[in-house]
Amino acid sequence: MFKKSVLFATLLSGVMAFSTNADDKIILKHISVSSVSASPTVLEDTIADIARKYNASSWKVTSMRIDNNSTATAVLYK
């Protein structure tokens, strides 16, 4: 029982530490990309190109829709 409690506490603290680190990032810009019949990889590559253009340290895709007019949104971080 003790081992399970320690394992659970360790996992929980790791999740809490990760979420704290993610919240510490400074938002640089919100972006949206779209393309006709694009694959997720194409949209993600476009987001990466925009992130490099703005010298973002990282980015996170916040939404993606793939159909005849594919779109994705992302947040760029300093």
Swiss-Prot record:
Answer yes or no on keyword Signal: yes
* Keywords on record: Periplasm, Signal, Stress response
Q: Which GO terms describe its cellular component?
A: periplasmic space
Where is it mostly found?
periplasm
UniProt keyword Signal, yes or no = yes
Please state what is observed when this gene is inactivated.
Mutants are more sensitive to HOCl treatment than wild-type cells.
A GO biological-process term: response to stress
- What Pfam families does the entry give? YdgH_BhsA-like
Membrane-spanning ranges? none
Regulation: induction:
Induced by RclR in response to hypochlorous acid (HOCl).
Which SUPFAM superfamilies does this UniProt record tie to the protein?
A: YdgH-like
Please give the InterPro entries that the UniProt record associates with this protein. Dodecin-like, RclB-like, YdgH-like_sf, YdgH/BhsA/McbA-like_dom
Enumerate the subcellular locations listed in this protein's record, separating them with semicolons. Answer: Periplasm
- Residues making up the signal peptide according to the UniProt record: 1-22
Protein family per UniProt? Belongs to the BhsA/McbA family.
Q: What does this protein do?
A: Probably involved in reactive chlorine species (RCS) stress resistance.
The name of this protein is: Uncharacterized protein RclB
